[in-house]
Amino acid sequence: MNIIQSGITAENSSIAIIIARFNEFINKNLLLGALDTLKRIGQVHEENILKIYVPGTYEIPTIASYIAKSGKYDAIIAIGTIIKGQTDHFKYIANDTSSSLSRISAQYFLPITLGILTTKNIEQSIERSGTKMGNKGSDAALAALEMINVMKKLKKVIYY
């Protein structure tokens, strides 16, 4: 029986982070968590990290598709915050964004991890961006690091 498991060090990897500017004060903390994890735990060199800012979370998939198609990056981390308002608009944004990112990831065989918060209120967003509930940007970075290594090991098994 073959088993593929992997670590979280990926020092020679290139990672793109797409950050929504909408709800920037929360997304800034998610980004800081992701960057800290990539550099400190993953040993990723700063020059191998590309940060791209977009207007909102809904715009992230367009850029993710462009990056994925380039073949230059080992993973993408999506960072954004969607907070429920008075209408169901946030559901459509959240569903469309996550579905699109999942489709792009599968189409290009590229890990795309979600550091996107979908919360009922601003307090929940703050809690998940570095206070009580940890930092979901950091969690997304950890997932990206592990997936990079899993994909590298899987390619060796499949292609060699």
From Swiss-Prot:
GO biological process: riboflavin biosynthetic process
Residues reported to bind (2S)-2-hydroxy-3-oxobutyl phosphate: Q86, T87, R128
Pfam families given in the database record: DMRL_synthase
Chain positions recorded as 5-amino-6-(D-ribitylamino)uracil binding sites: F22, T57, Y58, E59, T81, I82, I83, L114
Pathway given in the UniProt record: Cofactor biosynthesis; riboflavin biosynthesis; riboflavin from 2-hydroxy-3-oxobutyl phosphate and 5-amino-6-(D-ribitylamino)uracil: step 1/2
Active-site residues, Swiss-Prot/TrEMBL: H89 (proton donor)
Record keyword Iron present: no
UniProt entry tagged with the keyword Transferase: yes
GO molecular function list: 6,7-dimethyl-8-ribityllumazine synthase activity
InterPro entries from the UniProt entry: LS (IPR034964), LS/RS (IPR002180), LS/RS_sf (IPR036467)
GO cellular component: cytosol; riboflavin synthase complex
EC number: 2.5.1.78
Catalytic activity: (2S)-2-hydroxy-3-oxobutyl phosphate + 5-amino-6-(D-ribitylamino)uracil = 6,7-dimethyl-8-(1-D-ribityl)lumazine + phosphate + 2 H2O + H(+)
Keywords: Riboflavin biosynthesis, Transferase
Quaternary assembly: Forms an icosahedral capsid composed of 60 subunits, arranged as a dodecamer of pentamers.
Family membership noted in the UniProt record: Belongs to the DMRL synthase family.
Purpose of the protein: Catalyzes the formation of 6,7-dimethyl-8-ribityllumazine by condensation of 5-amino-6-(D-ribitylamino)uracil with 3,4-dihydroxy-2-butanone 4-phosphate. This is the penultimate step in the biosynthesis of riboflavin.
Name under which the protein is recorded: 6,7-dimethyl-8-ribityllumazine synthase
Organism in which the protein naturally occurs: Buchnera aphidicola subsp. Acyrthosiphon pisum (strain APS) (Acyrthosiphon pisum symbiotic bacterium)
Gene: ribH
